[in-house]
Amino acid sequence: MKSAKKLLSVLCLGIFILTFTACDMVEKTPEAKAKSTIAKVNGEKIQRKDLDESPSMQQVLSQIKTQYGEEFEKSEQGKEVIKEQKKQILENLITEKVLLQKGKELKVIPKDEELNKEADKKVNEIKAVYNNDEKKFEETLKSTGFTKETLKEYLKDQIVIEKVINEVTKDVKVEDKDAQKYYNENQSMFTEKPNTMNVSHILVKTEDEAKKVKKRLDAKEDFAKVAKEVSQDTGSKDKGGLLGDISYSDSNFDPTFMKAAIALKSGAISNPVHTQFGYHIIKINSKKEYPVKKFDSVKEDIKKQLKQEKQQEAYTKKIEEWKKASKIKTYEKNLL
């Protein structure tokens, strides 16, 4: 099972007209279901087997079996969960189909010899994950529904998709001034050690409630006592609102909350801060802040990060444009 999950994880890194006839009243055979059309992209079919045999779907099924047991997918709830997952994966397959079609249009598909060579290289990279143990590799392929041939075809498609993405993003550039601006605006991200703050908060529903809480705290009432009394954050209420030590770069907290907390000095209490969860009164119990690294020492890392972000933006914009211009039809009734 672990080997199968490992292969699926490696593969998933790559990417990533209802007609009612008498035939619809007849139960389809497994073979017929596998060949049923679940989408058409500019006239090209995506069959159910393309989805069911995809690494993404295999990974979903593996996770469901591990978490809920073998019988879950047969239940009504299980079928609904799987159908929703299939819808998401189908959207990815549609995107891939558009990209493969654009590969032909943009003439970025390598000649067969080169494509085979690149695919073989990727196969060898996957084998290396299994320490080049051929038997273990073949057993894992079998358990994930792949053969050597279908794996290679899948990898060929991923190579073409990668080349299309590279073509779309090839003109993306980041200047030193862009990196300097980002550095100046985010210096807390470039300290010699991660800056941390010990934080407490009180969460209430409305701004009026938050103002009343702030008034009590301004009158020198004990923060922990007030938090235990009125805070609606069940995770920290009984601890007097204590959230503990938080890194300045912690992405588990609301960005507005983090921005307000970072701006406070040690010992300070904020005015009401509005986030998706309600209104917070934030207290900084203590801070540990470290010197900022010199710009030149982090410049290339910043440029690399910004370039990746710009490439993602360019790719997302282009694929949305291509999909909008494509003739796409889905057949959700054939997903299950």
From Swiss-Prot:
What the entry lists under Pfam families is as follows: Rotamase_2 (PF13145), SurA_N_3 (PF13624)
**Keywords associated with the record:** Cell membrane, Isomerase, Lipoprotein, Membrane, Palmitate, Rotamase, Signal
Q: Which GO terms describe its biological process?
A: protein folding
Residue ranges of the TM segments: none
- Record's superkingdom? Bacteria
* Covalent lipid sites (S-diacylglycerol cysteine): 23
Which GO molecular function, any one, fits this protein according to its record?
peptidyl-prolyl cis-trans isomerase activity
Lipid-anchored residues (N-palmitoyl cysteine): 23
Q: What class of enzyme is it?
A: isomerase
Q: InterPro entries from the entry?
A: Foldase_PrsA (IPR023059), PPIase_dom_sf (IPR046357), PPIase_PpiC (IPR000297), PPIase_PpiC_CS (IPR023058), PrsA_foldase (IPR050245), Trigger_fact/SurA_dom_sf (IPR027304)
Q: Where in the cell is it found?
A: Cell membrane
Q: What are the annotated GO cellular component locations?
A: plasma membrane
Q: What is its EC number?
A: 5.2.1.8
The region annotated as signal peptide is 1-22
Signal: present as a keyword of the record? yes
Membrane topology, from the record: Lipid-anchor
Catalytic activity annotated for this protein? [protein]-peptidylproline (omega=180) = [protein]-peptidylproline (omega=0)
Kindly indicate whether the keyword Isomerase belongs to this entry: yes
Record function comment: Plays a major role in protein secretion by helping the post-translocational extracellular folding of several secreted proteins.
Per the record, the similarity remark reads: Belongs to the PrsA family.
Q: What is this protein called?
A: Foldase protein PrsA
